[in-house]
């Protein structure tokens, strides 16, 4: 029986299952947002939590006395903020959070094996809800087993105390952990004897930080959100704000209207870099988009390095 369970565990892939579904063909869009973004957000909110519940959560989204959107890390304005200081992605993310009341309890883990869980998508896992208690995967087992908190703490303590040095441990956490929990967590780690405290921002920005430090002396960006409005030129390499952080499109729109030259470098022409129909403007709702990029350099894959060297 143990050998059979081990075989089942080995079949479980750490990669997400590849599923190609709902594929559509058509002419590529020439702009992002507009009325389709509003209607898509409303449909999602109505389906997930209902318009009333979603709207109640949207009121405080990215406001000074509210809460930060979990969808991306785009900064909030220091001064005036719109009543709807969020994008389509943020509206959908908050609506989903408000609607999800599911829980992953003992019955859930009794039903789903590790192999079965590995065959599901990230979106499916999100819809199952939150953990209600600690779980452990015993050696040779095919299912996670719920345990009480005392046993969970003992398991963690045994592993940590068995290390030759505290620096052999890495205490990874979320960059969106609330201040109180983050303070207690880092206090525990420092008392344990190490400062190995990475969070999710390290995965996103480690490469840019490594390049910025020898270049300008600090591993962080040195601009503020207001600088976008005053910039004479903005270069965007290998990203699509319309997908990654749509609120950036508002800042790019203001910069473009102020005469800024926006140069996009990407092998694929992304709609969000071509034009932006601001859904909070009448012309945007009517589909009249502001052209964003003054130049779109459609380099080949890995051609950005040659371009940068040519710009030196």
Could you tell me what each predicted segment is?
Residues 2-312:
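Catalytic alpha/large subunits of respiratory electron-transfer oxidoreductases
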């Amino acid at each position: 029986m143990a050998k059979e369970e081990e075989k089942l565990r080995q079949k479980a892939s750490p990669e997400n299952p590849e599923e190609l579904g709902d594929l559509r063909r058509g002419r590529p869009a020439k702009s992002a947002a507009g009325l389709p973004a509003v209607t898509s957000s409303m449909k999602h909110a109505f389906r997930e939590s209902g318009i009333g519940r979603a709207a109640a959560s949207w009121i405080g989204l990215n406001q000074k006395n509210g809460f930060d959107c979990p969808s991306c890390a785009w900064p909030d304005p220091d001064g005036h903020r719109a009543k709807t200081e969020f994008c389509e992605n943020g509206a959908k993310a908050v609506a989903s959070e408000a609607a999800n009341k599911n829980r992953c309890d003992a019955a859930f883990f009794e039903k789903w094996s590790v192999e079965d869980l590995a065959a599901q998508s990230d979106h499916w896992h999100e819809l199952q809800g939150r953990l209600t208690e600690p779980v452990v995967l015993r050696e040779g087992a095919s299912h996670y087993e719920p345990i009480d908190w005392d046993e969970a703490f003992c398991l963690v303590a045994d592993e940590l105390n068995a290390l030759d040095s505290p620096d052999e441990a890495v205490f990874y956490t979320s960059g969106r952990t609330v201040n109180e929990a983050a303070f207690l967590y880092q206090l525990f780690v420092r008392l344990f004897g190490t400062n190995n405290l990475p969070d999710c921002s390290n995965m996103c920005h480690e490469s840019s930080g490594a390049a910025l430090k020898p270049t300008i002396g600090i591993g962080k960006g040195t601009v503020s959100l207001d600088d976008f409005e005053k910039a004479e030129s903005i270069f965007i390499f290998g990203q699509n704000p319309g997908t990654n952080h749509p609120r950036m499109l508002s800042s790019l729109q203001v910069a473009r209207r102020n005469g800024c030259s926006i140069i996009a470098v990407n092998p694929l022409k992304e709609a969000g870099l071509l034009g932006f129909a601001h859904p909070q403007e009448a012309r945007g709702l009517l589909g009249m988009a502001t052209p964003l990029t003054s130049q779109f350099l459609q380099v080949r894959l890995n051609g950005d390095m040659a371009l940068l060297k040519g710009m030196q």
